[in-house]
Swiss-Prot record:
Role noted for this protein: Endonuclease that resolves Holliday junction intermediates in genetic recombination. Cleaves mobile four-strand junctions by introducing symmetrical nicks in paired strands. Promotes annealing of linear ssDNA with homologous dsDNA. Required for DNA repair, homologous recombination and chromosome segregation.
Alphabetical UniProt keywords: Cytoplasm, DNA damage, DNA recombination, DNA repair, Endonuclease, Hydrolase, Magnesium, Metal-binding, Nuclease
Cofactor: Mg(2+)
Biological processes per GO annotation: chromosome segregation; DNA recombination; DNA repair
Catalytic activity, as annotated: Endonucleolytic cleavage at a junction such as a reciprocal single-stranded crossover between two homologous DNA duplexes (Holliday junction)
SUPFAM superfamilies associated with the record: Restriction endonuclease-like (SSF52980)
Species of origin: Listeria innocua serovar 6a (strain ATCC BAA-680 / CLIP 11262)
Protein name: Holliday junction resolvase RecU
Annotated residues for binding of Mg(2+): 87, 89, 102, 121
Cofactor binding note: Binds 1 Mg(2+) ion per subunit.
EC number: 3.1.21.10
Transmembrane segments: none
Length: 201
């Protein structure tokens, strides 16, 4: 049966408002949107919950520039800027030893740019090493699916090489030569304490 409007105009069905049929794309379940920081934060939360280690991510320092006080009892920050962090991302205690490390990730597949680090971070890590702390860097090559644990004493020569006019990056093969690869799992997600046990205890 044909449906029409008064005056003889034909009715045509409109699909507006109906859900459109989308082409299904395959779902991948591996590391969906997880960053290195997310993985490490989940890992250290697991360590803490299971009394394995006490490691925390340091908050990023913020400089507050302008504050508004709409009421006497409340304040509203109107303008603030991230300060350059003066030390590393993570620190804590494991098996009675002080642990301090910086974590970086890259989308590169052939090398890691040293511009991701700052002089003051290198100075801080060198000072921790002098005090016999466990200090290292964790570098994730996201596209390769590789995460590397590098003791600071093995990483620092690459920084010195750059400072004296050499390469401004570290090749993946150089990193593989001096690092311990961190396995990716469920709980803990990135068990970097395995590397500490292997290299320091």
């Amino acid at each position: 049966m044909a449906i029409g409007y008064p005056g003889g105009k034909k009715y045509t069905a409109s699909h507006e408002g109906l859900p459109s049929k989308k082409r299904k794309t395959p779902v991948t379940y591996g590391k969906r949107g997880m960053s290195l920081e997310d993985d490490l934060n989940d890992t250290i939360a697991y360590y803490l919950a299971h009394d394995i280690a006490v490691i925390h991510k340091k908050p990023t320092p913020v400089q507050i520039v302008s504050v508004d006080y709409p009421k006497r009892s409340s304040a509203k920050i109107k303008e603030a800027y991230f300060k350059t962090p003066s030390t590393t991302d993570y620190n804590g205690v494991y098996k009675g030893k002080y642990v301090d490390f910086e974590a970086k990730e890259t989308q590169n597949t052939t090398s890691f740019p040293l511009s991701n680090f700052h002089d003051h971070q290198m100075t801080h890590m060198a000072n921790v090493l002098k005090q016999d702390g466990i200090v290292f860097v964790i570098i994730a090559f996201q596209k390769l699916g590789e995460t590397h644990f590098i003791p600071f004493e093995k990483f620092y020569p690459f920084w010195e090489r750059m400072q004296s006019g050499g390469r401004k990056s570290v090749t993946i093969s150089e990193i593989q030569d001096v690092s311990d690869q961190v396995p990716y799992g469920l709980n803990p997600r990135l068990d970097f304490l395995q590397s500490i046990d292997k290299l320091y205890f």
